[in-house]
């Protein structure tokens, strides 16, 4: 199918798009030596650090390094995918605006009959009545159920990389800005075809039983700075359709590269933290910067 998502959606959410999703915490799995990838763009009066994140982490995961801490301390401004990452009200308002529509088919009819029992189990675990899901657009239902998967893995939004990086900037009164808004991020899903949305929902339901091992492998790849391991999630065309890849990755990476190129024209030191998937693979932000004559040097 052109809308194939198999085995890739969960990892895309954690390292690619969803910094506003969340759940509760458990102990972290064993990790390799911490060395998450970081790059630097620099000229005579401007320095931009690029750091790839995981949007949700388990409790106790070690990932900080001296090089990263020095870059954060020396930066005047923090740039995230979404600045108000912990603003649940903004997320709820955006979801209500974009994710609810009248006249939709029942949610049970939007997955194959063989998968309905598994989906209903996740709906029950979410604590949201199925009648509410019937009113949600398919992409919104998928995101809501993805939260069940995160909860099962013990992931905590307060421990996500963006929240932890943001604290020293906010407490010291430094600027924190976003490349996008929550509504803009949800809007990427809202523009997907219904076929792509249903593939997304089915993928969330099917992946729920498989994600523990996937998450452990992806987390180790991120922690150790294994770009090839991260990129496999995003470059495998059997895991992401061209429609999804364009909407959620390629177009956004190009827009961010444009933003970075403009930012390099102004003096100062900036720390940019975005999902690790955007900084790995064939359509990475760095490769798009290279087309503009800007080379990001890996420094960790």
What is each of the regions a protein language model found here?
Residues 24-33:
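Boundary at the C-terminal end of the N-terminal hydrophobic targeting segment
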Residues 33, 63, 255:
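Short, conserved clusters of charged catalytic residues that mark active-site
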Residues 239-300:
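A cross-kingdom marker for long, charged
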Residues 37-248:
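Structured, acidic catalytic/metal-binding patches in enzyme active sites
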Residues 32, 42, 264-266:
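Extracellular/periplasmic catalytic domains that process cell-envelope and extracellular macromolecules
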Residues 11-21:
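Bacterial N-terminal signal peptides
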Residues 2-13:
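Bacterial N-terminal signal peptides that target proteins for export
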Residues 13, 34-36:
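Short beta-strand-initiation
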């Amino acid at each position: 199918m052109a809308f194939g998502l198999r085995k890739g959606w969960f990892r895309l959410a954690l390292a690619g798009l969803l910094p506003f999703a969340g759940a509760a915490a458990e102990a972290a799995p064993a990790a390799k030596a911490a060395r998450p990838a970081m790059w630097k763009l620099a000229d005579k009066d401007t320095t931009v650090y690029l750091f790839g994140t995981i949007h949700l982490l388990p409790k106790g995961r070690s990932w900080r390094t001296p090089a990263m801490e020095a870059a954060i301390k020396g930066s005047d401004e923090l740039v995230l995918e979404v600045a108000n990452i912990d603003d649940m009200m903004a997320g709820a308002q955006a979801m209500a605006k974009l994710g609810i529509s009248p006249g939709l088919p029942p949610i049970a009819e939007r997955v194959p009959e063989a998968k309905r029992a598994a989906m209903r189990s996740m709906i029950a675990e979410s604590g949201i009545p199925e009648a509410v899901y019937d009113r949600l657009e398919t992409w919104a239902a998928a995101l809501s159920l993805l939260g069940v998967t995160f909860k099962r893995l013990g992931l905590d939004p307060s421990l996500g990389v963006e929240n932890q990086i943001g604290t020293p900037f906010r407490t010291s009164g430094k600027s924190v800005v976003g490349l996008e808004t929550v509504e803009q991020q949800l809007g990427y899903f809202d523009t997907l075809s219904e076929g792509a949305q249903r593939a997304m929902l089915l993928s969330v339901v099917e992946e729920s039983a498989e994600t523990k091992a996937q998450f452990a492998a992806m987390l180790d790849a991120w922690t150790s700075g294994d770009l090839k391991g991260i990129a496999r999630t995003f470059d495998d065309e059997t895991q992401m359709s061209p429609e999804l890849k364009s909407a959620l990755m390629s177009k956004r990476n190009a827009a961010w590269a444009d933003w970075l190129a403009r930012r390099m024209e102004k003096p100062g030191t900036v720390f940019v933290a975005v999902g690790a998937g955007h900084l790995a693979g064939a359509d990475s932000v760095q490769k798009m910067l290279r087309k503009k004559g800007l080379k990001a040097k890996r420094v960790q």
